[in-house]
Amino acid sequence: GVPMRIVVLTVSDGCFEGKRQDRSGQIITDWIATSGYILVENDVVPDEKDVIADKLKSCADSGLADVILTTGGTGFSLRDVTPEATKMIIEKDAPGLANVLQDHGMKKTPFAALSRGLVGTRGHTLIANFPGSPGGVQDCLEAVEMFLPHIVDLLNGHTQEHPKKD
């Protein structure tokens, strides 16, 4: 089929202001290149709920992205509002996938429990919140990788390819 089209959105005041290098976004873009997927856009936004929500909405509604992966803003600091912004614009919540990300991360570190990241869909686009730490991003990619092609197929209306269970 057609390669998956992915948007990477780094949510970080520090990266947005140029004070911090975006290592986590880089891990995702490297993975996209290695996997043979298409990087549609790689952007950095500040930890501002409306800015994040508007960006997610316009990327999903453009029809240009199958998947939007965010990194950052999922923790407990007062500026961490990525899940809240995501919640504003998703149409369907996918708590099972959020659990998969968290469970996988917790095999590496108990601190994965502190990520409040959401996963959900808007139209034909899957949106997943990854943590801001490079290690957390790596763990999330490993956890979600196997599901992405099937989810994208389903979101695009290809329902006949259900993996069969005996």
Region spans (language model):
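Non-catalytic beta/alpha edge segments that cap or flank active sites
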Residues: 1-166
